[in-house]
Amino acid sequence: MEVYAATGMPALEIIGLPDASVKESRDRVSAAIVNSGFTMPISRLTVNLAPADQRKEGPAFDLPIAISILMASGQLEGMDLTQTLMLGELSLDGSLHPVRGALPMVISASEQGIVDIILPEGNAEEVACIQGLRVYPASSLRQVVNHLKGREPIPVQQQRQYSDVVSAVKCAVDMAQVQGQVGARRALEVAASGGHNLLMVGTPGSGKTMLARCLPGILPPLTFSESLETTRIHSIAGRLAPGTGLMAERPFCAPHHSASVASMIGGGSNAKPGEVSLAHNGVLFLDELPEFSRNTLEALRQPLEDGVVSVTRIHNQAQYQSSFMMVASMNPCPCGFYGSKTKKCRCSAKDIRRYLDRISGPLLDRIDIQVEVDAVPVKEISEGGAAESSAEVGARVRKVRELQQARYAQDGIHCNAQLDAGLSKKYCPMTPEATALLHMAVERMGMSMRAYGRVVKVARTIADMDGADIIGTTHVAEAIQYRELDGKYWKG
């Protein structure tokens, strides 16, 4: 950032491809300087934001612009701030407000060797776990100036350990609340253990949504590196409340079925991240899957396969990570009661086929586990014993995930769902009987090669849950079972 003070009519001009919010900082900065007890220079000021060909967005430039003007006018002298990062939005009275994107800016500065960080108090907790920094949380422009002059130094933000953040995570919906549903609970545990995509098909009120909302409680907490990735995306999107620290619980995003392609994938004038990126390292829950538009569903295919999504706009292009578990639920027909034992379906065969055909074959191929969720009889609810809690199930899931992380430590992946074809051959050995069973199922069920690969990965997860190094027939049989809805609803 550069400031040039020239003779002429008093004015403040900001150049360097600023957006509207940066241009508006002229009035905010001028008022903040005066109302903080300083003097706005009576000269023509030009603020240059380099590089000139990169668009500058957001009000985070307010504080550094104000400090630069005070230095250019001689009200701040004798200090070198080239190794200090400043950011923050100024109000008209000079107070500082938090800004979105603080975490990625601080991480980028740290990677360039910058240690001293001055930012709004509302952003301090967001960066408290980043080691090796001196973070000074400020409440106003006046406080920043007094700190720089050495009159009233701002206390350095106390650094936090990420383990303290993890210990504060609490389960929102406990699996102990789910009565019955033995098969669905098992499928949920398998999906969580391997990071697999899951589709639940069942009548209204059968418990599909509650099962999905139990998933974050049985998934292991985010690792520190995963937390940085996920929190960075949420910070860019402005989804972090002021005073919020790093995220430890895996995100659970549940967009409405009216969501557009832009809101799902990302977009807008500033190329903001969409739901697939906000769900990075977590869960993207699509309730009433066939109700989403065809374009929106088809747009999911690329991030599901690659784990990244590119958002291109006129002035900038951004690439966001989007490695998530997709969990979807749907009714078996438009009225919801096809195959129900208690209510009669009112839909014609044509209506049911049209409804199911809203989900394309390529998208179905990318869903590893398909399970039917039937309504639980009232007698089973009233007489059933206590179900396992999320803590009990989560302990088993964490054990399996730790096994996978150790196995893939040199391969750059974390769980079985991320295996590619080459790694599958390396890490998924099968007994001859299991191989024969799988080949027979592929021929009879008409599986694509993608579906075949996903059955192998699910079988690897089931074997891990059993503590087996080699995949056996029971593991393959259960994995094949999770593809049977293909034949019942889509290929029948």
State what each model feature region is.
Residues 1-199, 203-209, 312, 451-452, ...:
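Peripheral, non-AAA+ core regions of ATP-driven protein-machinery
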Residues 40-43, 80-81, 111-113, 131, ...:
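Short loop/turn elements that form and flank the Walker-type P-loop nucleotide-binding site
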Residues 152-190, 194, 221-276:
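P-loop NTPase nucleotide-binding/switch module
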Residues 15-26, 41, 48-58, 270-271, ...:
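Basic, amphipathic alpha-helical bundle interface domains used for macromolecular binding and assembly
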Residues 200-241, 306:
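Walker A/P-loop
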